[in-house]
């Protein structure tokens, strides 16, 4: 049998020995057909994002946060805080804008979560530094425009109206507003997407399943971001110490309705935030049910309600609204007056009523007054002062703690847990609260399994650097409190406040003397003037002794040839201060005035 020659032998790995037991020769793959070994690619560096809180940490108010990534910056909120009781003469406190002014060319816009003063109150002062576009929901923009009108800035500012679920492109940032419940309509959280990842800043929020309007908080969108991956969550800590859930706004309507029933045959005066459109609408609806007319008092109340009606957020039946001047034309049981002053503001309408200085309204025994808001921390004394004043005038006053009229606009612990569970953040930064509230919120996050190494309690001025690999702190930036006193912004500092505190406690003694510019000899005086220290006519011996002490101090300066006037003033001040303290155990401010001739 003829043998067939194998012309194309199979590859060695697929061949076996033939029947003869001989192995076939191996064939080598040509060199050029070998696959080159791929060089190992270096791991791509994680893109960082910087978060600079300029306000709102360790305090309730003055909220302002700056984000920076890839050379672009955006700002979220720009609020104020009301002054503490020891900030004499200060009208408000705003953030220090030094850092944002230094980086103004990088800033792509200012995003606002909602229209409360602690989130929008400082905007006019920022716009006086430089122009930038403002992004906010319809009502929020309306409230800001009202504020800017007072500063002549409304026509110069660019507003961009935002809508929940519609994304905004700002440099390298893509921002999506997310609807949340709060005590004011049109409140949003922000999902801030950048090359570093997605950060969610909640703004002020609560989870109300039966809100008055606008629908519940958008838990679906928050959950979707949680499924995609959230780099960090910055969440409202105001009620971090309160267990359970925040009560629904529906509860307020029931509470106020019961108070209306108690106020039969009386005039009703209700104080609330001018920006709390929900609450004002509830009051209007109840007044209509009760057959009462409604009037507004307080500039911000009048302006905000007019704007809310114009934008369709408030509905007042025709014939219901009257002016404050018309109140006395109706019987007390037929009117409701909605006013500002729920926080004890000295110049508010309710404060002027309590001090009998309101031009149109006189409070008396026929009035039923409801303060429909809890005092912001630090305002308790001011509110108490107003309550006492109203009670002394004979009015019946309902305030926080007596009935469940105020309902918080902030999430309690269970709502905070739900926010953390839905968003599943890698890193967590509690914001918007005093340190004890931030700390408690951090503990809540840790109880849900977030590693403590991924939780950071920052401070105003911190430089928080986030990436997919780590969270760390960089060099801090300039941050602080700038005090506004009348038209002065930043010209009142700690030294001025210390002097004002000193004056308020112990008063002032002024020393006036005329001296020879060459010899230092006293030519006239010294004369002593007391303001807030003692009444001179009733303390003549004290003041005579003080005058002798000053004369002796000036004579010693002449004898010792002291010619430096600052040194002379210091000696006089020290001598008189020591004498007054020995006699009275008080330390008034002493101001020597030496006039050279």
Region spans (language model):
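His/Asp/Glu-rich metal-coordinating catalytic cores
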Residues: 28-111, 116-330, 348-362, 381-385
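Short Gly/Ser/Thr- and Asp/Glu-enriched loop/turn motifs at secondary-structure junctions
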Residues: 163, 459, 586-590
């Amino acid at each position: 049998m003829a043998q067939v020659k194998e012309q194309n032998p199979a590859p060695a790995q697929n061949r076996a020995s033939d029947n003869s037991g001989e192995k076939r020769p191996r064939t080598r793959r040509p060199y050029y057909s070998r696959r080159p070994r791929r060089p190992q690619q270096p791991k791509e560096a994680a893109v960082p994002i910087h978060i600079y809180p300029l306000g709102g940490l360790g305090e309730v108010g003055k909220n302002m946060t700056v984000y920076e990534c890839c050379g672009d910056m955006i700002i979220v909120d720009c609020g104020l805080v009301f002054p503490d009781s020891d900030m004499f003469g200060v009208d408000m406190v705003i953030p220090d804008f030094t850092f944002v002014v230094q980086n103004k060319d990088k800033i792509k816009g200012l995003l606002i979560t909602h229209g409360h003063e602690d989130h929008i109150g400082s905007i006019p002062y920022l716009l006086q530094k430089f122009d930038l576009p403002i992004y906010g929901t319809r009502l929020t923009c309306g409230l800001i425009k009202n504020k800017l009108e007072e500063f002549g800035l409304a026509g110069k500012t660019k507003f961009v109206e935002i809508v929940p679920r519609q994304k905004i492109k700002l440099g390298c940032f893509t921002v999506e507003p997310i609807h949340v419940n709060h005590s004011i309509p049109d409140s949003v959280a922000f999902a801030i997407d950048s090359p570093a990842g997605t950060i969610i800043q909640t703004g002020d929020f609560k989870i109300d399943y039966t809100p008055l309007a606008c629908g519940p908080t958008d838990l679906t969108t928050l959950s979707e971001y949680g499924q995609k991956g959230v780099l960090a969550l910055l969440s409202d800590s105001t009620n971090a110490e309160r267990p359970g859930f925040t009560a629904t706004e529906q509860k307020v309507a029931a509470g106020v309705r019961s108070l209306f029933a108690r106020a039969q045959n009386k005039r009703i005066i209700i104080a609330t935030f001018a920006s709390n459109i929900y609450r004002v609408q509830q009051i209007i609806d109840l007044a209509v049910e009760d057959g009462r007319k409604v009037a507004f008092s307080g500039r911000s109340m009048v302006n905000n309600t007019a704007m809310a009606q114009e934008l369709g957020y408030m509905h007042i039946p025709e014939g219901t609204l009257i002016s404050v001047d018309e109140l006395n034309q109706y019987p007390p049981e037929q009117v409701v007056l909605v006013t500002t002053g729920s926080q004890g503001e000295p110049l508010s309408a309710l404060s002027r009523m309590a001090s009998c200085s309101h031009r149109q309204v006189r409070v008396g025994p026929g009035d039923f007054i409801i303060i429909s808001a809890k005092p912001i921390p630090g305002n308790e004394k001011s509110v108490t002062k107003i309550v006492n004043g109203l009670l002394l005038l004979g009015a019946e006053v309902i305030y926080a703690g007596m009935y469940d009229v105020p309902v918080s606009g902030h999430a309690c612990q269970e709502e905070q847990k739900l926010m953390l569970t839905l968003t599943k953040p890698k890193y967590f930064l509690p914001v918007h609260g005093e340190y004890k509230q931030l700390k408690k919120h951090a503990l809540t996050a840790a109880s849900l399994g977030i590693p403590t190494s991924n939780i950071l309690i920052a401070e105003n001025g911190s430089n928080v650097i986030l990436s997919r690999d780590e969270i760390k702190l960089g060099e801090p930036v300039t941050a602080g409190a700038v005090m506004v006193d009348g038209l002065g912004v930043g010209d009142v500092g700690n030294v001025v406040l210390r002097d004002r505190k000193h004056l308020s406690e112990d008063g002032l003694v002024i020393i006036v003397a005329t001296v020879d510019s060459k010899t230092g000899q006293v030519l006239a005086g010294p004369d002593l003037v007391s303001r807030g220290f003692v009444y001179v006519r009733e303390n003549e011996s004290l003041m005579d002794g003080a005058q002798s002490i000053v004369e002796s101090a000036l004579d010693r300066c002449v004898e010792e040839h002291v010619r430096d006037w600052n040194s002379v003033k210091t000696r006089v001040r020290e001598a008189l201060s020591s004498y007054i303290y020995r006699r009275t155990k008080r330390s008034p401010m002493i101001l020597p005035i030496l006039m050279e001739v």
